[in-house]
Amino acid sequence: MKKQEQNQFLKEFGISLIKMFPKYIDKAIYSKGELTLHVKPTNLIALMKILKNHTNCQFKSLSDLCAVDFPEKKERFEIVYNLLSVRYNSRIRVKTFVDELTPVPSVTCLFQAAGWFEREVWDLFGVYFTNHPDLRRILTDYGFEGHPMRKDFPLTGYVEVRYDDEQKRVVTESLEMTQEFRSFNFTSPWEQIEISKPNIKEKK
């Protein structure tokens, strides 16, 4: 399938999906050769089942699942699902939006790959996935506090993890935010060049 034909197919496919399942899809956006569907968290599983099992869809592969944090928005977390249809050689993106307290239903019942993806989003952003079989941290250390990919998470973190040579083990200590004295009295490179001034005599 040529690129122009594929783009036209995705446009028509998006229109058809909205007509067939208007109660599941809030919005369909086609931009730069990509189709994106917006869905409420409560309708996520139903829409994913359709996209995976419908004869004209066959998006059986979840190639990626990630999150984006927009602190200025009421529903600050944007959860993004990237699906692939090998049969029709096409991709589609599904987005849902939640705040800090609203959970998202897990899609592990449909896509096995979602297990680690959802754990990563939970670990880094704090988005909770209901009905996940093993929702634990996956990248940060045991006992880690907070979710480091949130925009309001401090760059230095809350604690320091280091190896103590005396105790011969890894220790966790509260982070001291005191800053060492720094001298900002730097000489400008232009000030190092002495320019001789012309000898100007006053006229009497």
UniProtKB/Swiss-Prot annotation:
Domain of life: Eukaryota
Keywords: Electron transport, Membrane, Mitochondrion, Mitochondrion inner membrane, NAD, Oxidoreductase, Respiratory chain, Translocase, Transport, Ubiquinone
Gene3D superfamilies reported in the protein's UniProt record: NADH:ubiquinone oxidoreductase, 30kDa subunit
EC number: 7.1.1.2
The protein's enzyme class: translocase
Pfam families named among the record's database cross-references: Complex1_30kDa
Tagged with keyword Transcription: no
Catalyzed reaction equations: a ubiquinone + NADH + 5 H(+)(in) = a ubiquinol + NAD(+) + 4 H(+)(out)
SUPFAM superfamilies cross-referenced by the UniProt entry: Nqo5-like (SSF143243)
Keyword Magnesium: no
Places the protein is found: Mitochondrion inner membrane
Quaternary state and interactors: Complex I is composed of about 30 different subunits.
Name assigned to this protein: NADH-ubiquinone oxidoreductase subunit 9
Organism: Reclinomonas americana
Gene name linked to the record: NAD9
